[in-house]
Amino acid sequence: MIKKIGERKISFSGWSNGRSGSNDFREMYGSDACECISSNDQYTFVFSQVRTLDLIELEQLLQSVGWSRRPIRRVKKALDNSLLKVGVWQHDPKFPRLIGFARCTGDEVIQATIWDVAIHPVYQGFGLGKELMSYVLRSLKDKGIERVVLFADPGVISFYQSQGWTLEPKGNRCAFWYAN
């Protein structure tokens, strides 16, 4: 069970590469793990592209933010075919909890599209979404990606605008087809 972590904002003291390179930490989260530690050292969140996402835990996270349920085999296939997958865990040496997630597709050269971004509702409003987006954009830039497109529900557009994203100006340059 995820506990409420308080009403105040967490200010982050910065990024590190995980417990000074501790082998246990690396085994738990993967070689690319980065910590984001609250300024009062009370909370540690770990961002990783390498740690395997538990599909049941991911499904629970996505349901917590109101996304519709999809068959696990389709979710696994989507993850397998993604350019970038990032998990965010609240660090606990015995039972780390997945509390955030982002997924991107792309051509691996010029353009990427961010399709999925989720932070568990208990952790929203603490700055973790901003940190996750910053991590994703840095990771895409490190891959040489020049342009990033983001699809977002209307209810979260203001969040992305506050992070410097701009809406597509003409509103008619994109079309969708949905299978029944």
UniProtKB/Swiss-Prot annotation:
CDD domains: NAT_SF (cd04301). Residues 45-180 form the N-acetyltransferase domain. Its EC number is 2.3.1.-. GO terms for cellular component: cytoplasm. Keywords: Acyltransferase, Transferase. Pfam families: Acetyltransf_1 (PF00583). One of its GO terms (molecular function) is N-acetyltransferase activity. The keyword Metal-binding does not apply. Belongs to the acetyltransferase family. Ycf52 subfamily. This is Uncharacterized N-acetyltransferase ycf52-like. It comes from Prochlorococcus marinus (strain SARG / CCMP1375 / SS120).
